[in-house]
Structures are given as C-alpha cells and as structure tokens.
C-alpha cells in the first residue's frame, strides 16, 4: 500500500500477507506501525477478494518484541498507543488471520500472535511475557485470551515468572498450532491461509464470531484497563525503576517502587 513505512503488504490470490517491517528494532510496535496495521486490516475486512491473512515480522530473528517503550509513557489519552485497536480488528474481522512466528514473540508480540486465529511457529521461535520485569502489564487481550489458549495456571505462570518458552513447549501447551523448520513459517502459514480460503466464507465468519462472542463484554474492560489504568501505572515510580533496571541490565531496587 502506498504510503506505508512500517508494514509490507503482499497479496496472492485470496491471501493477504502483512509483514511488520522494523527488523532493526525487533519489529516493535510504534504508533505508526499500529496505525498502518489498523488501516491494512480495515482494507482486508472490506475486500471481498481476500478471504484469509497472514501476519508476520520481517527477518528471521523477530516476530515482534512488543511496543516501542518510548511511545508508551504519555499520560495524554490522545497519545496512547492504539494497540487495542489492532487486537480488536484481528478479533472482530470475520476472516481468519494466521500468525507466522519466525523468531522472538515477546510482550505485545506474544499477545499479537495469541489474538490471531492460528499460529505457525518456526522451530527457533521464542515466546515470552515480560511486563512485570520491565514495569508494564497487559490489560485485556493478553490475559484473558492467553488464559483461553493455554489455561489459567499456565497463563499466570507466563505473566508472573516471565520465562522463555521454546516453539516445542509452545506447541505442547497449545499456544501454537504447528512448528516448522526455521525459515519456513511464513510459507506454511500462507499454505494454511490458502486452505482456509477454500472453505465457506460465511461459515468461517460465523464460526469466528461465535468463538469471540462471549468476550464482547470484556472488550470494554480491556480498553478501560489499557487506555486508562495502564497509562496511569506507567507514571509510577515502580514502573520507572523497573524500566530503567531492565534497560541497564541490573536488578531492580524494590525500595524505589514506593519511596
């Protein structure tokens, strides 16, 4: 699409492929990236010739390692990163989105693939939630959708302990659908999307709506928590100390959380 700087768009028959194109930055999600993804997903929604999509990150090291930290600290509501808009778009479009995880899926990147309908992971993929380590947290999709996907205990383990999980472990816990050799995730995801595109679009759309229906009431809570509560949290001393410690590769000082 003309004018995009952070997202590459490719179509092959009924399949759309969206690639987050910031490999030098770990394919982090800044405001520009999210606005382009939101626009591309809206075009996908309204194009009758496109029946399935693939979402991936450029390069072979990173799928996405979350939000651009420098753009997440404003208390101005108008400046909140529109990441919930992207999650919501993927969740509510009556067409399937298949994630191709080709490397690290960390923080918001792990949430991003979780919100997708299916996930194909390369064998070198790594999955991790890091919020409590770096002074942040997920306020909606990354908690209850993750719980739906891997179970309550495992989801809390991922969030509370911030461990790294291999592609094999992710497959075992149900976080991904399939693991393929390194470098083959995108191609395999496109094959899966093309196969889905041969099915009834109305039936697939109805199924997706049914899967998402029981979460509709939670969406407003997710928005409130992300856009308001998380924004306020990022201004606390605790969030600042955790973020600074992570950047400096040192242990955080808990005394600075409230002093």
Regions from the PLM with identified roles:
Residues 33-37, 82, 112, 185, ...:
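Hydrophobic alpha-helical membrane-association signature
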Residues 1-56:
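Conserved CoA-thioester-binding segment of acyl-CoA-metabolizing enzymes
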Residues 24, 60-61, 144, 156:
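Glycine-centered loop/turn positions within well-structured domains
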Residues 89-201:
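Crotonase-fold acyl-CoA enzyme core
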Residues 18, 22, 36-37, 55, ...:
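Terminal peptide-recognition signature
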Residues 69, 83, 143, 152-155, ...:
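A general structural signal for well-ordered alpha-helical segments in protein cores
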Residues 1-13, 47-48, 60, 162-168, ...:
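C-terminal alpha-helix plus adjacent terminal tail
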Residues 35, 49, 57-89, 105, ...:
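Glycine- (often His-adjacent) and acidic-residue-rich active-site loop
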